[in-house]
């Protein structure tokens, strides 16, 4: 069997041994169900996932499936491997930018204030320009914050890429048309409180107003440090604007990653990128499912 979770087995097995007082429980002569060792291990997994702030609802779903699977004689590493695989499957296959379709490909970034949308745009744009030699352009519709526009302009200057400021869907389409020969057009939008209906409507009109001749996709940028209840409210707000893929920022500012799984399962949106610092373009990567799952199970990346 491929040892996908060695980094976790040692930690969890040690906890299991301590919980049993260092002794192996006696097996019944004719076992009819999971042994006390196996059930103790499931309890440890339960505790570990909760400690990493996976919602109790999802922990119960996953471990409920595992308890049905357990048979007498199953080793703890078999149980852990099955939990690992179930978590991997629940996260799904992360997706990068979809460059299919006619140029230019328009990429919207939406999300609340303070999550790092503008920096995330710069990181992705830098990757595609430098690593893949794509022509990139920027549009900002974040006219509420002068600092955001200035920040994006700095990145545009560094990448020697054009940038436009737009105030309406008409101006947006004019700007996109101007960049018709570019591969990627990145659109920065204003962050807003999920309670602000007016700004929400502005973003919706902008995204839905893109001329259908252009291919486009939307990324919801969320901070991994945001409280679960607030994340649910944010997702509920933005899902009324558009379908989206998920980007999680600030992974370097938290030690628990349960909300990444919680929001993936709650939103049923595809995962895309994670960021773990301010350095452009380095501190970004495609969502590393195996690394995140290992951390959820108490291991190291």
Regions found by a protein language model. Give the residues of each.
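Inter-motif core of Ras-like GTPase G domains
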Residues: 177-184, 199-225
